[in-house]
């Protein structure tokens, strides 16, 4: 199970995604933990079984157990937070004075370098489409001294994984419908 299997699963019309997936795994802008944590958290955020299985297997070979669990934790807590904060954002500030009341302890104590965890939360928030969370995590990353190039590379990784997941679902759906 691997990125190579995902590339092979992509249909011809998704050739750009295949090339981008190959390129992102060779990035020099992200260190290994940043890259594979971003890929794993993004794969979890897509809710695509095949993408998560393939990325998860390769990430398990690369990441420490702590980083592996933290990346999945980022995807989980952001699934909750992205819905909450995106939903509250639709309400024109009428609920901004109320306490969220949601447990999110992993954000304060992720078990890995805080900036890496924030990077994974940023990537997942982009996939889940929460502008407030994307902006908040980007601000935290910049305050921590993370470069714009590193942040953009994580965004690219999230975009590629999201596109791969969609292309695979589209291909599988059309194959079973025809």
From Swiss-Prot:
GO molecular function, one term: alkyl hydroperoxide reductase activity
Reactions this protein catalyses: N(6)-[(R)-dihydrolipoyl]-L-lysyl-[lipoyl-carrier protein] + a hydroperoxide = N(6)-[(R)-lipoyl]-L-lysyl-[lipoyl-carrier protein] + an alcohol + H2O
Transmembrane segments: none
Active site, renumbered: 130, 133
Domain of life: Bacteria
Family of the protein in this entry: Belongs to the AhpD family.
Biological role: Antioxidant protein with alkyl hydroperoxidase activity. Required for the reduction of the AhpC active site cysteine residues and for the regeneration of the AhpC enzyme activity.
NCBIfam families: ahpD, ahpD_dom
Subunit record text: Homotrimer.
Name the UniProt record assigns to this protein: Alkyl hydroperoxide reductase AhpD
Native species: Mycobacterium avium (strain 104)
The organism's taxonomic lineage, starting at the top: Bacteria, Bacillati, Actinomycetota, Actinomycetes, Mycobacteriales
